[in-house]
Amino acid sequence: MDPRSGEERTFSLVCDMGPGSFGALWAHVCPCELDALALSHCHADHMGDIISLQVYRKWGPGAAASALPLYGPAETLRRVRQIENAPDDEAYEVEFAFTHMQLGEAYQVGPMTIRPYRALHPVEAYGLRIEGPSEQDPERLVSLFYTGDTDLCDTIIEGARGVDVFLSEVGFTSDENEPDMHMDGTRAGEVATRAGVGRMIATHIQPWTPRDRVASEVRQTWSGPLDFATSGMQVIL
């Protein structure tokens, strides 16, 4: 339910917009109907398709009447300009309303609440805890934590504490991993266990990495439900 109008409708929040995601988005919602976009960080593999969204919202049929709330790190506007090769005075005020996410703050998107938690990555980066009413029982609060890109750290464990779904990056295997950048399966599983999550979904897996290798590492530290994110996958809470 829309907390402002009291009307029942579906709210749509997108977390990150890497290459190819804008095209895939159409299978789920028209881009003009988005309620907000949240960026975990500003590396290109997590925001490269934002210019496709920008072009649509400015020039496309049914372009939005108001700017889309865009939550992200301090450098978000600068990075959007870089991707488009736009001048320094381009504000994208027709397309986006930029908000620099602050630790300890909560951001409302309809009935959903977004809370950022500091991630351990070479740039300003956040894990995102999202809470809102259950699809099946609107009186019940459900939660998801998306790690973005991070290595294991206390703030990510704190953000994931007790969530129903833990959407975790598993960027590399234990043989490949660089510290303070990504998690391997063992460390991602450790976060899931220490945070006491209900279900883990592994994502951000490299195309050359076999799933059974990831599962084997995760199972060293996590014994709960484990799935792998796939294109078009739906999880109903």
Give residue ranges: language-model regions:
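Binuclear metal-dependent hydrolase catalytic cores
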Residues: 1-146, 151, 156-158, 215-237
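Cap/insert and terminal regions of metallo-dependent hydrolase folds
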Residues: 151-236
